[in-house]
From Swiss-Prot:
Entries under PANTHER family matching the protein: METHYLGLYOXAL SYNTHASE
Cross-referenced Gene3D superfamilies: Methylglyoxal synthase-like domain
MGS-like domain sequence ranges: 1-137
InterPro entries: Methylgl_synth, Methylglyoxal_synth_AS, MGS-like_dom, MGS-like_dom_sf
Record's GO cellular component terms: cytosol
UniProt name for this protein: Methylglyoxal synthase
NCBIfam families for the chain: MGSA, PRK05234.1
GO process terms (BP): methylglyoxal biosynthetic process
EC number(s) per entry: 4.2.3.3
Keywords: Lyase
Function per UniProt: Catalyzes the formation of methylglyoxal from dihydroxyacetone phosphate.
HAMAP family, per the entry: Methylglyoxal_synth
Molecular function per GO: methylglyoxal synthase activity
Amino acid sequence: MNIALVAHDKKKDDLIVLIKTYAHILKKHQLFATGTTGKRIAEATGLPVHCFRSGPLGGDQEIGAAVARGEMDMIIFFRDPLTAQPHEPDVSALMRLCDVYSIPLSTNMGGSEILIRSIEQGDFESLKLSHNDEPPA
């Protein structure tokens, strides 16, 4: 699976804790991230991470484009709901695309743990069957 990892500044440490905890599962998949988040994850875990641009410089949009092309299977996005983000429209657009293309999206630790454990159990088989379909009209 192709999994995108994104975190606002105040949530990066939380995301790294999640990735370290589930590295034994995530190492079997391709990890993608926005710039700073990806670099921090790679440094902290040793896992290979393909880095897009930083979120405010278009990284969220790059991940959104990958979703629209059928190239992402899951998004874990630890948002900071208490701090205004200058690129909030990009964040909203990414979340919208996840809904349009039925891509699993989690924005917090609890939901992310469920998604990652579901990967290990093979719970995303129907997603593979419909992954490249056009979105509904």
